[in-house]
């Protein structure tokens, strides 16, 4: 008899992906969350998964309860009721750690690039053999017959510690989540602890000296552009159609590859995937074939064109990610003006990385800023304002609101890159509506 799973906070990116996966494996799945629309809920609705408003009435003892990591008894009535009644529940990462033991699991960790790399690895492997996966953009696939499970391993609050994968990629480490981590050394220690739990193979970006300090019982393979790495991407050609490159292992060419993706970071992501699958014994000709058809993941360089205007939506909310996204935009659109519209995410991150944000955004030709999106875990105490960031940006910068995005019209032959982890998509939708109305009025 199949179980019924109840997700407290089902619209969370990891939670929605896990819910979809369990649903596809034949289990009954339901969940609760706030009414506000979030991009992950579309997949749940299409699958027929019930999404309820938070209420203790949703809870019964016979449910398998999975709680999102952000929820506590003092901020969620369902979890408070579960604890009061003494019902058993698991946190998302605890459940996932137990769940993956039935598969050969492949994790993707790193400060940046986790979701894109997980998506790429899952895409290639599922087209070669039956594979379940869980991606941080809210998508998941569950198959009862799968041998492999590809998943995203999140370092925040050390959530990846219940995971003991056979293989894992670590794309990079960087100081982020200043509300939890005390500094880069704290971040490194978390990743090092995770690395010790990997069993058969660890694939690490080799051009960050700090990452060479990571230790593990599993064999470590380094990848990158430099000859000192085990897996090396060479003979790179970056065009408006994507990136072509060869990969060498122990000085021998193992294949020629094309990814329809932009930016140096996506070549590195692909090289990590190739390295992992090569060590697993997967046919490189099949890997090359399926790399070509990767269409990306949600909210990672997602493009749309409205009346000849190119709009890019990206989750970038850290300076390193902003630089990578703008680099990708320049590769694909070398003759266009790059206009960045950025919403800082959390006051703690904005304060901690103010100068770095200013430097990163200055890679664009023009910059527009939205008000800082505070997290539910923090209070705006006035320590930092978006105007403080605007004052540090070298390029032309201005402020926009959801109600007034018309300053964005002051550009010809431009690509508009909307970036952020908050509600930046509201600004994007306002701009799209403005463009649509202009088109209607000129017809």
Curated annotation (Swiss-Prot):
It comes from Streptococcus agalactiae serotype Ia (strain ATCC 27591 / A909 / CDC SS700). Belongs to the MurCDEF family. ATP binds at residues 110-116. Its main location: cytoplasm. HAMAP family: MurC. It is found in: Cytoplasm. Its EC number is 6.3.2.8. Pfam families: Mur_ligase (PF01225), Mur_ligase_C (PF02875), Mur_ligase_M (PF08245). PANTHER family: UDP-N-ACETYLMURAMATE--L-ALANINE LIGASE, UDP-N-ACETYLMURAMATE--L-ALANINE LIGASE-RELATED. This is UDP-N-acetylmuramate--L-alanine ligase. One of its GO terms (molecular function) is ATP binding. Pathway: Cell wall biogenesis; peptidoglycan biosynthesis. GO terms for cellular component: cytoplasm. Keywords: ATP-binding, Cell cycle, Cell division, Cell shape, Cell wall biogenesis/degradation, Cytoplasm, Ligase, Nucleotide-binding, Peptidoglycan synthesis. It catalyses: UDP-N-acetyl-alpha-D-muramate + L-alanine + ATP = UDP-N-acetyl-alpha-D-muramoyl-L-alanine + ADP + phosphate + H(+). Cell wall formation. One of its GO terms (biological process) is peptidoglycan biosynthetic process. InterPro entries: Mur-like_cat_sf, Mur_ligase_C, Mur_ligase_C_dom_sf, Mur_ligase_cen, Mur_ligase_N, MurCDEF_pg_biosynth, UDP-N-AcMur_Ala_ligase_MurC.
